Amino acid sequence: MATLYQHRFDDVADYLHHRPPYLLIDSIESISDDAVKAFHTVDPESFFIRGHFPGAAVLPGAMMQEMTTQAGGVLIAANFNPMADYNTHDPHHNELALGVLVKIKHGRYRGFARPGDKLSIEVTLDDHIGDVFDFHGLIRCNDQLIYKNAFQLTNLPSDTLR
């Protein structure tokens, strides 16, 4: 089994290669051994809100899936990182791309998020074998569950994505 490293960073961008406008994790409240809690405030100016739907804007469901995926990526980078020297600011630095989405097992929408809403994103690691990680996620808006899912992420050689 490969050596795994734990990393703790002050900036969300140090965990993920995503950058605005597609970085959907605004802040991280906590990281434990098998879970992460993060937040996102729905920005009325974001590219995916302006056209979904003019005059009655709601956050697209695909963005909620992506929020949980990014939170899962944070957990992998934080606790299950096979790289001691991890740098998300240079796209060619890391030998592996961590937390690449390979499967959405299920997703269930139970409500809407609108511009200005602050979303709580909770993702828990259910299992992992090697570089394959199974998660479930919950997103809440005003303490109401609006999305839940199960998904799988994996680590791939970085050159696969080039």
Residue ranges and their predicted role:
Residues A2-L4, H17, A35, F112-R162:
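HotDog/MaoC-like acyl-thioester-processing domains
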Residues H18-L59, M63-M64, A77:
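Catalytic strand-loop segment that frames the active site of acyl-thioester-processing enzymes
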Residues M63-A71:
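Short amphipathic alpha-helical face segments that pack within enzyme cores
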Residues A2-Q6, G73-S120, I146, L153:
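Hydrophobic beta-strand-centered segment that forms part of the acyl-chain substrate-binding groove
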Residues M1-L16, H52-V58, M83:
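Mixed-charge, low-complexity intrinsically disordered regions
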Residues F9-R19, P91-L96:
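Short aromatic-glycine motifs in intrinsically disordered, low-complexity regions
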